[in-house]
A protein has these predicted regions:
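Long, contiguous binding/interaction regions
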Residues: 3-98, 106-206
Length: 206
């Protein structure tokens, strides 16, 4: 791993974290607080709550760069851990024609969490993004089944919204309401993206 301090603002449109992009962990430890603080405004614009329990966290090169470093720093698996972390998190970086998000159902009460998730099987297939005449159905990551055989949803879902060239151009130019929604019969909720969030996500479509 490299020992240089990385300027994340210069990495805005990178689509993959490479081993050469990683800091020496001793050096990362020195700037860890600074790097986490740098991403607070970015993460705020990428956080979209929907309904009482769900939150979308739209990912980017910067958020995944930080997440990979955090995993390496906390777990201390050494060089052998690096390929696994890159393989796990690189698919969540938008590639220029998609928006990528981690959807989390955040419920502290264990009994309530089990009850809610037990009724949300297949929720990953009911997510959409709508703007103007365009509606984009979310595509779930297929690394593992996010719904169990007995119909229980995972509390963490990884999803993508895939855009055509025309849809990407339309989204970047669109100045009306952008709706993010879930159509699951047991969690029918929708929300409008803030102007800040819409602009941030539009910049992901290059």
């Amino acid at each position: 791993m490299m020992g240089n301090v990385v300027n994340l603002s210069e990495a805005r449109h990178k689509t993959e974290v490479k081993a050469a992009d990683l800091m020496d962990l001793a050096e990362y430890g020195k700037v860890r607080k600074q790097k986490r603080a740098e991403l607070v405004p970015l993460k705020k614009a990428r956080r979209v709550p929907i309904g009482p329990h769900a939150t979308f966290y739209f990912e980017s090169y910067e958020t995944m760069w930080l997440q990979i470093h955090e995993m390496l720093f906390i777990e201390k698996g050494g060089p052998d851990q690096i390929p696994d972390e890159l393989a796990a998190y690189n698919p969540l970086i938008p590639k220029g024609r998609d928006l990528s998000a981690t959807l989390m159902f955040e419920i502290d009460d264990e009994k309530l969490r089990k009850s809610v998730l037990g009724r949300l099987g297949g929720v990953e297939e009911t997510i959409f993004l709508k703007f103007g005449d365009h509606e984009i159905q979310a595509r779930a990551e297929t690394d593992v089944d996010r719904t169990t055989a007995d119909g229980k949803a995972s509390s963490v879902q990884f999803i993508h919204f895939d855009f055509t060239d025309d849809q990407a151009a339309a989204f970047k130019d669109f100045d009306g309401d952008v709706m993010l929604g879930i159509r699951h019969e047991n969690y029918p909720h929708m929300t409008l993206l803030s102007a800040d969030t819409k602009a941030t996500l539009g910049a992901d479509l290059v």
